[in-house]
Amino acid sequence: MAPESLAEVPGCNCFWYLGVVAATWWGLRAAWCLLNGARVWVLGSGAQVGPTIGKWAVVTGATDGIGKAYAEELARRGMNIVLISRSPEKLEEAAIHIKQKFKVETKIIAADFGKPTEIYERIEAGLRDLEIGVLVNNVGISYEYPEYFLEIPDLENTLDKMININIMSVCQMTRLVLPGMLGRGKGVVLNISSASGMYPVPLLTVYSATKAFVDFFSRGLHAEYRSKGVTVQSVLPFFVATKLAKIRKPTWDKPSPETYVRSALNTVGLQTQTNGYLPHAITGWISTSLVPVSAAISMGMKMNKGLRARFLKKAKQN
């Protein structure tokens, strides 16, 4: 004899309640994401970042791309700028431009982060007695083109440089600047990671791993020192129109460095881990919440194999 209602089916009520619980959970999660997104991307102002937390900002990799944009935006907000990069000529040019345009003080320190034993004592001396409110650890290098690990040109030297520039510079610069921030009970450390550090990226494996380190280091450090007034933020951009990314023309999803940095600074104090820019945040949420890591790795492999093939074909033709 057939049951007269679904309630008479054994276990039906359990499935119904489970469905209600699941739907409620997903609804609450979606609502939280929307509210949090509005808090960050609509209400965020970046008011925390400026001369009230310290007269000086220090920016590594400050003469190009995102680093240059951070230096100029922080100068626009009234902070004096210490620019650290490899080329003395480009540093002089950037310092003069910032000083004339924004009417702030500038200081330059020429340093090759790929040769760490030669630079940190000199950087420490150059930063001595400065009231540093913001440190932007931006300097970084990537591959010339996607490549299998053992086939990376000049592999041993490339590994040393990438680890020294992408990882050691972040640790050492933080070591130099953080004590002064703790002494004043305020400061902001912005560590520029990459969306490539959100999951493994085949054929950019070492670069991806170094950026994952920056992300983990930043979030751990923030937990250690936030109660003492220091904010540490991990910034994970997707593509930005820079020389490093080999993108010349900005688009809505590949913004100029200036557009990206203005947006990213508005998230300071609101997110300890940020993609920095609304279209990037949406992409980041999709790629980490909806796409399985295994699928993201497979897509990265397929994309980079294509880029590798095109690069090698072009190199062979030349």
UniProtKB/Swiss-Prot annotation:
GO MF term list: estradiol 17-beta-dehydrogenase [NAD(P)+] activity; oxidoreductase activity; very-long-chain 3-oxoacyl-CoA reductase activity
Pathway: Lipid metabolism; fatty acid biosynthesis; Steroid biosynthesis; estrogen biosynthesis
Keywords: Endoplasmic reticulum, Lipid biosynthesis, Lipid metabolism, Membrane, NADP, Oxidoreductase, Steroid biosynthesis, Transmembrane, Transmembrane helix
Annotated catalytic residues: Y207
InterPro entries the UniProt entry points to: NAD(P)-bd_dom_sf, Sc_DH/Rdtase_CS, SDR_fam, VLCFA-Steroid_DH
Membrane topology: Multi-pass membrane protein
Compartment(s): Endoplasmic reticulum membrane
Enzyme class: oxidoreductase
Gene Ontology cellular component terms for the protein in this record: endoplasmic reticulum; endoplasmic reticulum membrane
Transmembrane segments: 15-35, 187-207, 281-301
Positions with a binding annotation for substrate: S194
Main location: endoplasmic reticulum
Protein EC: 1.1.1.330, 1.1.1.62
Gene3D superfamilies reported in the protein's UniProt record: NAD(P)-binding Rossmann-like Domain
Catalysed transformations (reactions): a very-long-chain (3R)-3-hydroxyacyl-CoA + NADP(+) = a very-long-chain 3-oxoacyl-CoA + NADPH + H(+); 17beta-estradiol + NAD(+) = estrone + NADH + H(+); 17beta-estradiol + NADP(+) = estrone + NADPH + H(+)
Biological process, per Gene Ontology: estrogen biosynthetic process; fatty acid biosynthetic process
Annotated NADP(+) binding sites: 54-83
Family: Belongs to the short-chain dehydrogenases/reductases (SDR) family. 17-beta-HSD 3 subfamily.
PANTHER family (alphabetical): RH59310P (PTHR43899), VERY-LONG-CHAIN 3-OXOACYL-COA REDUCTASE (PTHR43899:SF14)
Described function: Catalyzes the second of the four reactions of the long-chain fatty acids elongation cycle. This endoplasmic reticulum-bound enzymatic process, allows the addition of two carbons to the chain of long- and very long-chain fatty acids/VLCFAs per cycle. This enzyme has a 3-ketoacyl-CoA reductase activity, reducing 3-ketoacyl-CoA to 3-hydroxyacyl-CoA, within each cycle of fatty acid elongation. Thereby, it may participate in the production of VLCFAs of different chain lengths that are involved in multiple biological processes as precursors of membrane lipids and lipid mediators.
Name this polypeptide is given: Very-long-chain 3-oxoacyl-CoA reductase-B
Organism: Xenopus laevis
